[in-house]
Amino acid sequence: MSSPLASLSKTRKVPLPSEPMNPGRRGIRIYGDEDEVDMLSDGCGSEEKISVPSCYGGIGAPVSRQVPASHDSELMAFMTRKLWDLEQQVKAQTDEILSKDQKIAALEDLVQTLRPHPAEATLQRQEELETMCVQLQRQVREMERFLSDYGLQWVGEPMDQEDSESKTVSEHGERDWMTAKKFWKPGDSLAPPEVDFDRLLASLQDLSELVVEGDTQVTPVPGGARLRTLEPIPLKLYRNGIMMFDGPFQPFYDPSTQRCLRDILDGFFPSELQRLYPNGVPFKVSDLRNQVYLEDGLDPFPGEGRVVGRQLMHKALDRVEEHPGSRMTAEKFLNRLPKFVIRQGEVIDIRGPIRDTLQNCCPLPARIQEIVVETPTLAAERERSQESPNTPAPPLSMLRIKSENGEQAFLLMMQPDNTIGDVRALLAQARVMDASAFEIFSTFPPTLYQDDTLTLQAAGLVPKAALLLRARRAPKSSLKFSPGPCPGPGPGPSPGPGPGPSPGPGPGPSPCPGPSPSPQ
């Protein structure tokens, strides 16, 4: 048994509480979200700590108690579901990141492929400039050669006469070299693509109404002047130009034609007619806007054709009797002169005053009568132009055949596969005569068309040709024999003035025992 002093030296060990507890109550620990992971790691053997009152100093000692298993299973299911959702979200984001990385890599490769290297871009630009320079040099050489064909030479303009617009700077800070010099602008000389035909016709009608009907005008003539009634000027309006009087044709792109149209549309008479008609003149308009005037660039030969390399079996006396005096007639002289000449925007009549002067000294022959022969090709072409005017015309052969006396000219529209016999039959029908009574020939080259089965294409009469007619001639080698007595000895009779042998005088046997020939 120990002494009291020994017991005083011993101290009693009191356990320290883990957390402050209210005296007289048991402490219950409340779990939050941060403790859910710790609870899962503890397993099913988790305990709930409860503080109970102690017999020493009122300090409660913790007491362990078993937690029910149903609460742990619900918590486990909740955490498993939440973990599954997080894993799925992480997987989807990972796949999206991988897809975007692949797209970025592909776009970077494409950018590297399309991005030209500086050296390659400079080389390509240099090749383009060299090609353009070669092309421009070739065009300059062609234009200089074209000008030299007409005896012209390009002079150009000095650099100090540039437009003020050439000194402007573009938005990129570079000078526009295309405006550094004055270049020809096609729009300054070309007509607008569209012409208001309705407005033009209305303006011409208004101008014609300004002239009093039956008005007269003093016209100078050789030896004085006379009053003439104003006759309407024929004006044909085509799709590509106009034609006043009998020509020449004035296309819309010609500057003089543009000035004429501008005067008409502004309500004035054309300035080129001011000298001939100072007080105005009415117009007789032919609306042919649906037709295109074909500009072949060559005027028809106004003179008389000549045959080269053909021998004429005529005597000199016959030629003198056939062509007495000068071969130049008044009509031929007028045909060599132009009808009208445009000088400084004015139409000058050439043939009119000269015709009036020659009319007093020598009568002018009648003009050649042109007769259009109605052919199947002409009827078909007329029907085609009415039904479908925009379709291109088929290849045709236009024949101009002059009669024997030169007073008539027959115009025939034929197909290239038609024959000479078809032409002969149509001419015989138009002239109301036998087809065998005339011959068809050409002067250059001198050709006589006798084969009626020969086509126009094979004869070289496409697309147009000028032919002549003449009376059919008998063969030159044909001889007619007439019965008669054979000449005896002595001087032989002369058969006639024509060529042929003439037996000379002297005895001898009869030259022909039968009938004597006499040339036709």
Curated annotation (Swiss-Prot):
Q: Where are the sequence repeats?
A: 487-494, 495-502, 503-510
User: According to the UniProt record, where is the region 3 X 8 AA tandem repeats of P-G-P-G-P-G-P-S?
Assistant: 487-510
Localization per Swiss-Prot or TrEMBL? Cytoplasm, Cytoskeleton
List UniProt keywords, sorted A-Z.
Coiled coil, Cytoplasm, Cytoskeleton, Repeat
Coiled-coil region: 76-149
Assembly mode: Interacts with GNA12, GNA13, RND1, RND2 and RND3.
Tell me, in a sentence or two, what this protein's role is: May be involved in the reorganization of actin cytoskeleton mediated by RND1, RND2 and RND3. Promotes RHOA activation mediated by GNA12 and GNA13.
Q: What is this protein called?
A: UBX domain-containing protein 11
Organism expressing this protein natively: Homo sapiens (Human)
